[in-house]
């Protein structure tokens, strides 16, 4: 067992449960599309974040150290994707029927986004550089951290989706839904600002 598994888990919980792009999109999707249609997003985050951790542990972190420009480019690509996503959320369909025909965020979009999500990339770099060392404990520690990331990711993203579904009960008319979508879009844009502070 990793000697610092408790602090690793606490860090993972704080990183996963606090507001950020993945959680805002889960909240929005749960609100607008329900639990079942948000499953691709849930699975994309649940598998994508641990896969990012694995890639970093296996050497991607060294590429970032030697070529920091690559990490900067990924941050800017992630920012552009979030702006696009905020636009999509803000101007989503005006009617309930159109919403039923729309597809929420797809699995592959969410999975790939984990490599562009500045909050997730930063959390992963901290986890890998602080708690995983090359040597005889590498496989054991990496496995434990990835399992923790899987559990924390699925729990947090599912909770945010259920919160979105719960808030749907208060949506009494289309105007409320439009304002909700504008608010989620604004929160997503606000989360971008925090990456540059």
Where are the model-predicted features located?
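Residue-level signature of transmembrane alpha-helical cores of multipass secondary-active transporters
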Residues: 8-12, 45, 110-114, 149-153
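Residues that mark transmembrane-helix kinks and helix-interface sites
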Residues: 21-24, 83, 122-125, 157-161
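Select subsegments of transmembrane alpha-helices in polytopic membrane proteins
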Residues: 44-48, 111-122, 181-184
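Hydrophobic/aromatic residues within the transmembrane alpha-helices of Major Facilitator Superfamily
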Residues: 13, 17, 50-51, 87, ...
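Juxtamembrane transmembrane-helix termini in multi-pass membrane transport proteins
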Residues: 2-69, 126-145
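Hydrophobic alpha-helical transmembrane segments in multi-pass integral membrane proteins
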Residues: 53-57, 116-128, 186-197
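Selective transmembrane alpha-helices of multi-pass membrane proteins
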Residues: 65-94, 150-156, 160-163, 168-197
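Membrane helix-loop-helix hairpins that form the core translocation module of multi-pass transporters
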Residues: 36-106, 163
């Amino acid at each position: 067992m990793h000697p610092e598994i408790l602090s690793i888990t606490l860090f993972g919980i704080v990183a996963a449960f606090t507001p950020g792009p993945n959680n805002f999109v889960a909240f929005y999707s749960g609100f607008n599309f329900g639990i079942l249609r948000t499953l691709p997003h849930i699975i994309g985050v649940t598998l994508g974040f641990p896969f990012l951790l694995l890639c970093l542990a296996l050497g991607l972190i060294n590429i970032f150290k030697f070529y920091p420009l690559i990490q900067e480019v990924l941050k800017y690509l992630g920012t552009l994707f979030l702006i696009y996503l905020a636009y999509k959320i803000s101007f989503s369909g005006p009617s309930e029927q159109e919403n039923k025909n729309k597809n929420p965020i797809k699995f592959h979009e969410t999975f790939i986004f984990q490599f562009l999500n500045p909050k997730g990339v930063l959390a992963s770099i901290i986890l890998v550089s602080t708690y995983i060392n090359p040597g005889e404990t590498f496989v054991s520690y990496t496995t434990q951290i990835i399992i923790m990331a899987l559990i924390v990711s699925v729990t947090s993203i599912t909770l945010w989706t259920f919160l979105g579904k719960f808030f749907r009960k208060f949506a009494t008319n289309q105007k409320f839904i439009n304002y909700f979508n504008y608010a989620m879009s604004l929160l997503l844009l606000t989360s971008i600002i925090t990456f540059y502070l």
